[in-house]
Design a protein with these regions (language model features):
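Catalytic glutamate of the conserved HExxH
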Residues: 148, 152, 156-158
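Bacterial N-terminal signal peptides
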Residues: 7-15
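Bacterial N-terminal signal peptides that target proteins for export
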Residues: 1-6
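N-terminal, motif-rich segments that launch catalysis or mediate targeting to/interaction with membranes
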Residues: 17-148, 162-258, 262-296
Length: 296
């Protein structure tokens, strides 16, 4: 079953997409820098598969373009009335309690990101555990689940994945989602200073995602204010607008990207440690196929 899943997901990775979360450039930047922070016990493995892992970190965005119902897994809409005021304690962190309180339909409508991050953290931990049992396709599963988990962790650091005003539609900032997460990074990538802190192992991906989303939510208003100031008096979002916008939000953008790098590395390390710190092979331990010699 895992082999079939791996093949299916690999095909989807190659599918073209117009949708994005942090933006493909940002997700891949974060993933590359996160690999650099991994400890020596596992860094050689991730370096060996660096190109594949960096490429696959955008897969969850690509899945949505081929009909997978994955949208709710990329956000959590803080700000909706039913969750109360910041820090939104009306929303239980335990999934079963949240479903019981709000119902699955409403919960899904407002986003499932922390629980998806936890699910993929578990998938990665189990993939690491397979190394200790010499399970076929353990290597392939880690190369698959590490970037998939990383994607959802990274989304929690994008402020507009943490608010019901996710595209500035409530405040006259329509389109801000892409301008902040994609356009700024693509235009100014070479000028960004990414300075991640040394990672600490993440032991609870759900709570880590919740905490990151709460921090993201508090950055929404300053970004919206900067957007309005940068576009004031203009009829279009020209180069001058983007330069002004970047100058105003650069500290926020650099900080969230840096923190996403640290969290990505911390989640990978945490999953590996919970799996018992197995030694990682760069080849799958597939069973030997024994063929009977033909009768003479």
């Amino acid at each position: 079953m895992r082999r079939i899943l791996l093949v299916a997901l690999t095909l989807l990775v190659a599918w073209p997409s117009t949708a994005s979360a942090w933006g493909f450039t940002a997700h891949r930047l974060i993933m590359r820098r996160a690999i650099d922070l991994l400890p020596p016990e596992i860094k050689p493995f991730f370096d060996h598969f660096r190109e594949q892992i960096v490429d696959r970190v955008t897969s969850p965005d690509e899945w949505r373009t081929v009909g997978w119902d994955d949208d709710p897994n990329h956000f959590l809409d803080f700000g909706v009335p039913e969750y109360g005021k910041y820090p939104f304690s009306e929303l239980p962190r335990e999934y079963g309690a949240a479903v019981e309180k709000f119902g699955l339909v409403a919960l899904k409508r407002n986003g499932l990101l922390p629980w998806r991050a936890a699910e993929e953290f578990g998938n990665l931990r189990r993939a690491f555990e397979e190394f200790a049992r010499t399970t076929p396709y353990a290597t392939s599963n880690v190369v698959l689940f590490a970037p998939v988990m990383a994607h959802y962790i990274q989304d929690a650091y994008q402020p507009f994945h943490a608010t019901d005003n996710y595209d500035g539609q409530q405040t006259g900032n329509t389109g801000i989602h892409a301008r902040f997460e994609r356009d700024l990074v693509e235009r100014f990538e070479t000028k960004l200073t990414i300075a991640p802190a040394p990672p600490k192992p993440i032991t609870n991906a759900r709570d880590a995602a919740f905490d990151a989303l709460l921090a993201s939510y508090q950055l929404v208003d300053p970004i919206l204010k900067a957007d309005k100031e940068a576009v004031a008096g203009k009829e279009r979002y020209d180069d001058d607008y983007f330069q002004k916008f970047f100058d105003k939000v650069r500290p926020i953008l650099e900080r969230r990207l840096s923190e996403a790098v640290t969290a990505t590395a911390g989640a990978i390390i945490g999953a590996w440690q919970q799996a018992g710190r197995p030694a990682l092979r760069t080849e799958d331990a597939r069973p030997v196929q024994r063929v009977r010699p033909a009768r003479q």
